Structures are given as C-alpha cells and as structure tokens.
Swiss-Prot record:
GO terms for molecular function: DNA-binding transcription factor activity, RNA polymerase II-specific; RNA polymerase II cis-regulatory region sequence-specific DNA binding. Residues 345-354 have a biased composition (Basic and acidic residues). One of its GO terms (biological process) is regulation of transcription by RNA polymerase II. InterPro entries: HD, Homeodomain-like_sf, TALE_homeobox. Its main location: nucleus. Transmembrane segments: none annotated. Residues 72-109, 152-184, 230-296, 365-396 form a coiled coil. Residues 73-119, 126-142, 266-300, 358-399, 436-526 have a biased composition (Low complexity). Residues 405-422, 532-547 have a biased composition (Polar residues). This is Homeobox protein 9. Residues 1-45, 66-144, 157-179, 262-313, 331-422, 436-547 are annotated as: Disordered. SUPFAM superfamilies: Homeodomain-like. It is found in: Nucleus.
Length: 639
C-alpha cells in the first residue's frame, strides 16, 4: 500500500511513485524488436498529450522534453548501444497496460527496489501535489498512470533520438576524420611519387649533362687529335717535297751503254791513245798541223750517247758527281769480294817473255790514224814516217789492237749481269776522259834532258809473232826528220805529261777496282800497255832497259792484297745464325744490325760475310738466280 501525502507536502519528502519506470527500463534492456514502429508511436503520443503533464488540474512541472529527468538519463546511460530496442519496449508497454499494472503491483510489494527510482523521480520531477493522494497512492487512477508512462516513454524516446543523433554525428565526424586521414594519406603518397619522379627526372638530367660533357670532351680530344694528324700530314708532305727535290737534284745519271762489239771498245781506246799522243805534241811550235788531229779525234760511243769534251764534265755532269758514282760502285764491289781462303791466293797472269817492250806504241797509233785519214798536207811528219815502211804501220796497228785487247779484257769483265759490265765500262771511260781533258788544259813547258831514257823506259807487249819490234824504223826516221831541239822538247813534254797522267789514273783506277776480284790484274795491264811508261825505280836490277818487265807483271804486285780475316768468335756467331736459317739465309736489316752489335763488326762486313757464306758455306744449288742474292741490288746506277 502506498502512503498518502498532503498536497502541501514536497514531493521529495515522502512521495513514492509506482515502480513502472524501473520495470520499463528493465524491459527496455531485454526487448529488441520493432524499432521504427515504437519510435513512430512515441511521436504520436507526444503530439496528443502536449508538452506538460497535468494531473487533476495540478501542473507538476514535468516536461517529457526536459533534459533534467533522471529516468531518461538513466536509460541513456544504460542503453547507448540499444536505443531502438528501447523504443520497441515502449510500444510494448503502451500496448500492454494490464501487464504493466500487474508488474507495478508486484514492484510495489518490493519497496527496496522502488526506493532508488522514487528518489530519482523526486529529484527530477519536483513536488507533485494532488488533491486525490489517496486515489493516487492506492493506484486506482489508471489514466494518470498511463500518462506518466507515456511521458516517460516520450522522454526516453527523445533521449534515445538525441543519443542517436549524437552517435550519428560522432560517426560522421569519425568518418570525416577517417576520410581526411585517407585523403591525407593519398595526398602524401602522391607527393612521395611526385618527389620520386622529380628525383628521377633530376637524375636523368644529371646523366644527360654528364653525357653531354663527355661528348664535348671527346669532341675536344678528337679535334686535338685531328689537328695533330693534320700537322703530321703537312710535315710529311713537306718531307716528301723536300725528298723529291733532293732526289731530282741528285738523280743518278743513266749509264752510258757501249756496243758489245770489240771494234767499238777498240775505237774508244784508239781515241784515248790519240788524245795521249796529241797531248804530247800540243806545245811544239813546228807541229801546228797536229792540232787538226786533235780536233779530228772523236770518242766513239753508242749512237744514243755522246761524251762532251769540256774540261771536268761528262755529259753535262760534274767530275765530283761521277766520282761519287764510282764510290758507289766501289761499295758495291765490296759486296762481291770474299774473305775466304781460296780468294786470298794470288792470281797469275799469263805472259810471254819472248817479246821486248814496244817503246813507241803512241807513235804507231798516230801513224795508223794518219794512214786512215790520208791527209798528206796537214800531217807531214807522220807521212814521212809512213812512206818508209807500210808494213811497220800495219804491224803497229796490229800491235796496238792487241794491246787494246787487254783493255777490253779489263773493262769487259762480265759480272752476273750485263748492266754491271756496261756500268764499269762507262765509268772507266768517263774517268779516263776526265783526266785527258784535264791534261789538255794543263800543258807545261818543263825541260828534261832524258829523251833516250824515256824511250827506253816505255814498256809494252805485243802478241805479234815478230821478235823484232816493228816500230824501230819508223821511230828512227821520225827522229831523223826532226831537229834535235824539237825532239828533245817533244820528249820532255811527253814524259812530263804522261807521268802526271799516270799518277792521277793510278789513284782513281786502283780505288775503283781494288775490291773487285778480277780488276786488279786487268788494271795493271791497262797501265802497262796503254800508258807504256814506268819510273826508273820500277826497272829491273840488271840494268837492261830493253828486257825490263813492267811492274804490274811482277809477282809481288800480281799477288792480291791479303785481306784481314774476321775473328773466330764473330764468324762462329754468324755461322750459328746461318745454319739456323739455312732455308732462308737472308737476314733483315734489323738482324744485321743486331749481329753487327754482337760481333763488333761493321754493317758492310756483315753484308760481305753473308754474300760469301751463301756461295761457299751453304751447299750449292742449280739455280743461282733463286738462291743467290742479285748483285748491285741496292746501289744499282739504273735506280
């Protein structure tokens, strides 16, 4: 039973309300159905009941939308997660009033449970004074209880809606924050990608800059290299131009080709002896007609080549130029010379001691030329000699040609090539012609009183079968027809000029033919036969001038000058190399230099040794053209 209170009594003193709200709260926590329906019913109930609760004309001051009711707050605190379920429970409560009443009755019987709820209602709702306290306490007014339940449900619904709105706002805020975070995350990723792209672009740009710098540096280096190459090309062009200019200035003369017939050589030798005879007669005041003989004497050469008669020149070339050619020939001839023992043996020249020397070959030659010309008016002295004995002239001519044969033998030494023989013949003839021209321009008038000694010292050999010299009658008649002073003057001039000529010829011919294997004896024959005079010291010791044999025919001169042998250590090194390379025994220039350094020999000695070794040390082969190295391959005049 509820206690009855006075109307003036405050609601907080002893007012007790039925524990319907507590039951409803418990039911709200247990019901989970019909969310939307309950909410709509609450709105309808609120619209019907109004804003304030009037119980029996008394304004209780309770508003279902007041934010200060503790019941709604309690429900909000307990039902944050189940707002919709509370609305459904309210609907169930509205529909089942009888059950609620029963529950209220049951709750009234348990005051302990209702004390807390009543206190909360007293705090929130204020004092509720009613004139019908007994009826209210007794629970007879069912309408008032329904209203209270409706207001409480409405308050609960409002609180639930507010909670829902708050939750929705929180959810929206959370979603917005999440979206902002996601957007910031997206933007940060994009920024990172942009930064990475910028870094890649910068790295590519730096690489491109480095490549451009490398290309520029390579271009600079290429330009510098091209500039250097252009400078080298210009220098090479200058060198080529200079070398071509020097080559044109030092171009070697073409060899003078002589005819192969012995008559051509004899004719050239005739002209040489004619020049000698004419040189002996240049300064005779009474023999002016002999000058015509000088003008008529011509050197017979091949039709395509002519020798100029100017002093010191041959074919437009200077004397020094021709002597340099002869020096080249000398160096070439050393390539053929051998250092072996069989070449050191003396070579004997066959001779016939039954013939006395012909003392007047020059006059015989002069007489022969006068017989060929038949100029009786211009050559009176020679014609007087020719009228006495024609046989003497013929014999003298034969003797002369025989003596010239030794010259042909000396000149016409046949090396391995025809060109070399032509070169030697041309060089010898050019050298002789130079000295004859020199002697023509340098005639002297020195006096010597040894005319008879000169004729006795003239040495010459003749291969004719006559034992008596055929020139004596003509020589005597020639001497008888001339005055003594003229004969003496002529003999003095002849002796002086021939001595000068012989000395100069001996110096040049011996140098050009000293290193040749076959030219030493032939050059000595050339001196003895052509020039026909020796010094008094060269005669034999017995004092017999008629039986004097020329110095070139003695054994000491005929014997070849012995060459020095190479050291045994050097030859052993060279032989070792030769036997190791016997299939191709031709060392290169670098190998020759190396061998020369190792053996302490000269480059020329190495060349000579290998040329001899290929001929004598290695076995001979049939084809020498293939096996042997060609002569004058490096210093040929034709190059």
């Amino acid at each position: 039973m509820l206690n009855s209170y006075s109307p003036l009594q405050s609601p907080s003193s002893s007012i007790t309300l039925p524990p319907l709200f507590h039951i409803n709260n418990n039911n709200n926590n247990n019901n989970n159905n019909n969310n939307n329906n309950g909410h709509n019913n609450d709105k309808q109930n609120v619209n019907k009941l109004g804003l304030k609760l009037n119980i029996n004309g008394y304004d209780s001051g309770f508003s279902p939308f007041s934010p200060n009711h503790s019941i709604a707050n309690n429900n909000n605190n307990n039902n944050n997660n189940n707002n919709n379920n509370n609305n459904n429970n309210n609907n169930n409560n509205n529909n089942n009033n009888n059950n609620n009443n029963n529950n209220n009755n049951n709750n009234i019987q348990s005051p302990k449970n209702n004390n807390s709820n009543n206190n909360k209602l007293n705090e929130s709702c204020g004092s509720l004074n009613s004139s019908n306290d007994n009826n209210f306490n007794s629970g007879n007014d069912d309408n008032s209880l329904k209203r209270v339940r409706v207001f409480s449900n409405q308050n609960q619904n409002q609180n639930q809606n507010q909670n829902q709105n708050q939750n929705q706002n929180q959810n929206q805020n959370q979603n917005q924050n999440q979206n902002q975070k996601d957007s910031w995350n997206i933007h940060f990723g994009e920024i990172v990608n942009i930064v990475l792209e910028l870094e890649s672009v910068l790295s590519c740009k730096n690489e491109n800059i480095n490549q451009i710098n490398q290309i520029k540096s390579s271009e600079k280096s290429m330009r510098s290299a091209l500039y250097k190459k252009e400078i080298e090309i210009l220098e090479l062009k200058d060198k080529l131009n200079n070398s071509s200019a020097t080559f044109n200035s030092l171009k070697v003369i073409q060899p003078i080709k002589l005819e192969k017939s012995p008559r051509t050589l004899n004719n050239s030798s005739d002209s040489i002896s004619e020049n000698i005879n004419n040189n002996n007669n240049n300064n005779n005041n009474n023999n002016n007609n002999n000058n015509n003989n000088i003008n008529e004497s011509n050197i017979n050469t091949s039709p395509t080549h002519e020798l100029s008669g100017s002093s010191g020149t041959l074919g437009g070339y200077s004397k020094s130029h021709i002597l340099s050619i002869l020096d080249d020939l000398d160096s070439e001839s050393s390539n053929i010379s051998s250092d072996s023992e069989d070449d050191e043996q003396p070579r004997k020249v066959p001779r016939d001691l039954n013939y006395k020397p012909n003392n007047n070959i020059n006059y015989a030659n002069n007489n022969n030329n006068n017989n060929n010309n038949n100029n009786n008016n211009n050559h009176n002295n020679n014609i007087n000699n020719n009228n006495n004995n024609n046989n003497n002239n013929n014999n003298n001519s034969n003797n002369y040609h025989h003596s010239i044969g030794s010259i042909t033998n000396s000149v016409n030494i046949k090396p391995s090539k025809d060109q070399t023989s032509n070169d030697w013949a041309a060089a010898t003839e050019a050298l002789l012609n130079l000295h004859t021209n020199k002697n023509n321009n340098n005639n002297n008038n020195n006096n010597n009183n040894n005319n008879n000694n000169y004729h006795s010292n003239n040495n010459n050999y003749s291969n004719s079968p006559n034992t008596t010299p055929p020139y004596q009658n003509s020589n005597q008649q020639f001497n008888n027809n001339q005055p003594q002073s003229q004969q003496q003057q002529q003999s003095q001039q002849q002796q002086q000029q021939q001595q000068q000529y012989q000395n100069s010829i001996n110096k040049n011919i011996t140098t050009t033919t000293n290193n040749n294997n076959n030219n030493l004896t032939s050059s000595s024959n050339n001196q003895a036969v052509v020039y026909g005079n020796t010094s008094p010291n060269q005669s034999s010791a017995n004092g017999n001038n008629e039986n004097v044999i020329g110095v070139p025919f003695t054994g000491s001169i005929v014997k070849r000058k012995k060459r020095g042998k190479l050291p045994g250590e050097a030859t052993s090194i060279l032989k070792k190399w030769l036997f190791e390379h016997n299939m191709h025994p031709y060392p290169t220039e670098e190998e020759k230099v190396a061998l020369a350094n190792s053996t302490f020999l000269s480059f020329n000695q190495i060349n000579n040794w290998f040329t001899n070794a290929r001929r004598r040390i290695l076995p001979r082969q049939l084809d020498r053209k293939v096996f042997g190295s060609p002569l004058f391959s490096h210093f040929s005049i034709t190059k």
